[in-house]
A protein has these predicted regions:
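Short beta->alpha connector loops
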Residues: 12-15, 37-38, 90-92, 113-117, ...
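Active-site-proximal region of nucleotide-activated glycan assembly enzymes
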Residues: 105-154
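Conserved nucleotide-sugar phosphate-binding/catalytic loop shared by glycosyltransferases and other
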Residues: 10-12, 30-65, 139, 150-153
Length: 154
């Protein structure tokens, strides 16, 4: 069995912070990170980093930025060829997740720690596509009955 290549992906802010809780796992595998470009430094020691545009669905620039991200993420995906994509969401990372499924790769989605009783919009979409879907609160199993609950990421 060959060593798997893993893409860890998240938008900026809290989603990225949650993803960083998986750093011990990142160190075990050939992996790289995809996140939004921000004014603050986001990096993981000894890991290749890729940056996509920040998106906000309420901004006028939403559609052009998503189109730009679509092409950036396709380039990243084809260049790196990950076997698995692990993500905490959200919007900016959706194209990467869909490319994983389109190319027959595994997709693992971790619903936000902040969502205790209601789903995220991205979570509702990814629940349909993810090979493994994790929730961080037991009560979220009522919303996502086929999800896996192992506790919080923190």
């Amino acid at each position: 069995m060959s060593v798997k290549k893993i893409c860890f992906a998240a938008s900026s802010g809290g989603h990225y912070e949650q993803l960083m809780m998986l750093q011990p796992l990142m160190e075990e595998y050939n992996s790289f990170v995809v996140t939004e470009k921000t004014i603050y430094k986001s990096s993981v020691e000894n890991k290749k980093m890729y940056y996509v545009s920040q998106v906000n669905r309420k901004e006028v620039s939403f559609i052009p930025r998503m189109i730009l991200n679509l092409f950036k993420e396709l380039y990243i995906f084809l260049k790196e060829r990950p076997d698995v994509v692990i993500t905490t969401g959200v919007l900016a990372i959706i194209p990467l997740c869909l490319f994983a499924k389109l190319f027959g790769k595994k997709l693992i989605y971790i619903e936000s720690f902040a969502k205790v009783t209601s789903p995220t919009e991205t979570g509702k979409l990814m629940y349909k596509f993810a090979d493994r879907f994790y929730v961080q609160w037991g009560q979220m199993l009522e919303i996502y009955p086929d999800a896996v609950f192992l506790g919080g990421i923190y």
